C-alpha cells in the first residue's frame, strides 16, 4: 500500500478529519488515525468517512493507553488497533514490545501467523513472517503493570495540571483537550 498523508488539526495536533476525504482514491484501503500524545482522534467522524467509502480503520494507540473518546477507550474503535509497550509509554515494559488487537477472526489468524515466522498451527510457513512474539517476562511485567494503569494515568494528569498552572500566564500554547476526550498525557507538547 502507498500511504496518503492527511495534515493535522493545529489545535489538537491530531489528524484533521475534515481533510481525510480529499486524499481518498480508488486504491485507498484503510484510514490509520494516530492517537497522538495521549489524546484520541475524532473517531466518530473517521468512522463515518470509513463507512461511506467501505474502508477499514486501524488505530495507532501507541501513545494513548487508557485515553477515551466519548467514554470509549482508545483501541476499541478500529478493525485493528496497535499498542506499543516501549518503556516510556503510559503502559510500558522494560524492553520493546507491542500488541495488535482485533475482533476480526480472519485478521487475527493472519496477525498470529505474521508474528510467528508466518507459521500456522501446523508449524508450516504460510507466508513471510517475523519473530514478533512478546516474551514471557515482558508479558508478566505488563500483566502486573496493567492493574495500575489508572494510577499511571492519574499521575500523568496531575503532572500535566501542574504544568498547565505554571505556564498559565505565559505565551506558551499548551495542549488542547477536546471536551469529549480523556487525555493521558503521554507527552505534554507546547508551542
Where are these regions (language model features)?
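Structural motif
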Residues: 3, 80, 97, 185-187
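PLP-dependent aminotransferase class I/II
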Residues: 7, 16-18, 22, 30-34, ...
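Short beta-strand->loop structural element characteristic of the AMP-binding/adenylate-forming
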Residues: 2-12
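Structural loop-to-beta junction motif characteristic of Rossmann-like glycosyltransferase folds
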Residues: 1-2, 55
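Active-site phosphate-binding strand-loop segment of PLP-dependent enzymes
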Residues: 11-93, 99-101
Amino acid at each position: 500500500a502507498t500511504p496518503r498523508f492527511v495534515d493535522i488539526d493545529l489545535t489538537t495536533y491530531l489528524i484533521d478529519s475534515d481533510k481525510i476525504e480529499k486524499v481518498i482514491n480508488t486504491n485507498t484501503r484503510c484510514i490509520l488515525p494516530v492517537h497522538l500524545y495521549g489524546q484520541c482522534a475524532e473517531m466518530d467522524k473517521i468512522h463515518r468517512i470509513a463507512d461511506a467509502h467501505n474502508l477499514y480503520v486501524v488505530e495507532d494507540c501507541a501513545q494513548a493507553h487508557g485515553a477515551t473518546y466519548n467514554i470509549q477507550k482508545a483501541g476499541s474503535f478500529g478493525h485493528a488497533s496497535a499498542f506499543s509497550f516501549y518503556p516510556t509509554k503510559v503502559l510500558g515494559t522494560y524492553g520493546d514490545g507491542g500488541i495488535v488487537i482485533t475482533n476480526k477472526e480472519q485478521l487475527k489468524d493472519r496477525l498470529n501467523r505474521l508474528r510467528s515466522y508466518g507459521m500456522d498451527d501446523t508449524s508450516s510457513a504460510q507466508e513471510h513472517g517475523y519473530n514478533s512474539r512478546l516474551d514471557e517476562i515482558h508479558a508478566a511485567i505488563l500483566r502486573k503493570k496493567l492493574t495500575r494503569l489508572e494510577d499511571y494515568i492519574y499521575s500523568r494528569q496531575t503532572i500535566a495540571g501542574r504544568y498547565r498552572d505554571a505556564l498559565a500566564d505565559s505565551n506558551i500554547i499548551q495542549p488542547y483537550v477536546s471536551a469529549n476526550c480523556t487525555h493521558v498525557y503521554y507527552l505534554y507538547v507546547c508551542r
